[in-house]
Amino acid sequence: MQTDNTKSNTNKTAKQEWGSFAFVICIALLIRILIMEPFTVPTGSMKATILENDYIFSTKYSYGYSNYSLSFFDFIPLFKGRIFAREPDRGDIVVFRPPNDMSVRYIKRLIGLPGDKIQLIDDVIYINDKKIERTEVGTYISEEGIKYLKFKETLPNGRTYFSYKLAPIYGVIYNDRYGNTDVFYVPEGKYFFLGDNRDQSNDSRVNLGFVPFENFIAKAQFIWFSTKITWWDNDIGVINLVLKLKPWVESVRLNRIFRNLYNTDA
């Protein structure tokens, strides 16, 4: 027979367990809101720096905080501007809300700072009338078998990275209008972004336009996981999930796990 003391101890233990669980959940939420957040990349606009289904670790504190960088609360107009703001560096890979569609998140490379004059001529970036250093270093063949020319680019601050351009097919250059643009004057408080996959990126050259600093969410740091296919498609049931588990495991890109996004040794 259970005594009143036994019941009291059981209830006390249950409350302690729920309290501990709630504490852990609160800490996890605070970490995601203020410190770091994982992102999944659905498109190839940053290929081959970032591939489709790469899982990115990003730091929320790198640029301070705005309404858009606070996970779970970004739909509530809590405040305007940024608090604890830190200026981004040219060449950063940034996760942000595009000003023309606040329902999605983009990830691109920051090229132009406020006050900059930006233009692309024959695929070469000119910043304030000075062309950046750009050297062809080889080719890249995508998982779909598409050939890209690979270039190493160096920005005025010394930061280097790789960009990619579709290789000409029978002498025909793809999407040449992306490589020869109008002049862009970056307004105060806004930034100019490009995708590393220069011929297949919706960036500041076309529909995206300039991105306000307020729209920045986080700075991308490294790839913590990567897979060629998505296992948890919304339109498949439990049986299909089980059947798809083996090919999903086999599709994991082991060579991309924990890859630093700013490493240009490869």
UniProtKB/Swiss-Prot annotation:
Its main location: membrane. One of its GO terms (biological process) is signal peptide processing. It is a single-pass type II membrane protein. Residues 42-266 are periplasmic. It catalyses: Cleavage of hydrophobic, N-terminal signal or leader sequences from secreted and periplasmic proteins. Pfam families: Peptidase_S26. PROSITE patterns: SPASE_I_2, SPASE_I_3. GO terms for molecular function: serine-type endopeptidase activity. Keywords: Cell inner membrane, Cell membrane, Hydrolase, Membrane, Transmembrane, Transmembrane helix. The active site is at S45, K108. Coiled coil: none annotated. GO terms for cellular component: plasma membrane. It is found in: Cell inner membrane. Its EC number is 3.4.21.89. InterPro entries: LexA/Signal_pep-like_sf, Pept_S26A_signal_pept_1, Pept_S26A_signal_pept_1_CS, Pept_S26A_signal_pept_1_Lys-AS, Peptidase_S26. The keyword Cell inner membrane applies. Residues 1-20 are cytoplasmic. The chain crosses the membrane at residues 21-41. Belongs to an operon consisting of at least secF-nuoF-lepB-rnc. Belongs to the peptidase S26 family. Complements E.coli mutants temperature-sensitive for LepB function. This is Signal peptidase I. It comes from Rickettsia rickettsii (strain Sheila Smith). The lineage of its organism: Bacteria, Pseudomonadati, Pseudomonadota, Alphaproteobacteria, Rickettsiales.
